Curated annotation (Swiss-Prot):
Keyword Zinc assigned: yes
InterPro entries xrefs: PRA-CH, PRib_AMP_CycHydrolase_dom, PRib_AMP_CycHydrolase_sf
Annotated EC: 3.5.4.19
Family: Belongs to the PRA-CH family.
Reaction equations catalysed: 1-(5-phospho-beta-D-ribosyl)-5'-AMP + H2O = 1-(5-phospho-beta-D-ribosyl)-5-[(5-phospho-beta-D-ribosylamino)methylideneamino]imidazole-4-carboxamide
Subunit-level organization: Homodimer.
Species assigned in the record: Pseudomonas savastanoi pv. phaseolicola (strain 1448A / Race 6) (Pseudomonas syringae pv. phaseolicola (strain 1448A / Race 6))
Annotated positions binding Mg(2+): 77, 79, 81
Gene that encodes the chain: hisI
GO BP annotations listed: L-histidine biosynthetic process
Localization per Swiss-Prot or TrEMBL: Cytoplasm
Binding-site list for Zn(2+): 78, 95, 102
Major subcellular location class: cytoplasm
Identification of the protein by name: Phosphoribosyl-AMP cyclohydrolase
Annotated pathway: Amino-acid biosynthesis; L-histidine biosynthesis; L-histidine from 5-phospho-alpha-D-ribose 1-diphosphate: step 3/9
Length: 130
């Protein structure tokens, strides 16, 4: 029997894009990367765990901020090369800027306009010692 992780088309770096969506509203919260271990741990721990390309290590969402993403459902797209995580975003903040979503800018009049408010100052989030 084929391992469920073997069905994924990992890129040349062994990663797959992972999109986190709010399980109730469907709003896209963020996009990050997962390697095989991150996806396996996400499924077993029922929380979002990503691969940090900049730090070169696993990143348990919320480990510093307390803004954990509880997993409700995992989905794989038709080409088996993108994952969607349907999550409950603890604290209502997914973005390191203190916003609900990382997608807080809208293209308008040949430029990017910030449309979502900062819900909590990032300095307060990351200095709280979570």
């Amino acid at each position: 029997m084929k391992d469920w992780l073997d069905e994924i088309h990992w890129n040349s770096d062994g990663l797959v894009p992972a999109i986190a969506q709010d399980h109730k509203t469907g709003r896209v919260l963020m996009m990050a990367w997962m390697n095989r271990e991150a996806l396996s741990l996400t499924a077993s721990e029922n929380r979002a765990i990503y691969w940090s390309r900049s730090r070169g290590k696993l990143w348990r969402k919320g480990e510093e901020s307390g803004h954990v993403q509880k997993l409700h459902e995992l989905r794989l797209d038709c080409d088996a090369d993108v994952i969607i995580l349907m999550v409950e975003q603890i604290g209502g903040i997914a973005c390191h800027t203190g916003r609900e979503s990382c997608f807080y800018r809208v293209y308008e009049n040949s430029g990017w306009k910030t449309v979502d408010p900062v819900l909590k100052d990032p300095d307060a989030i990351y200095s709280a010692g979570h």
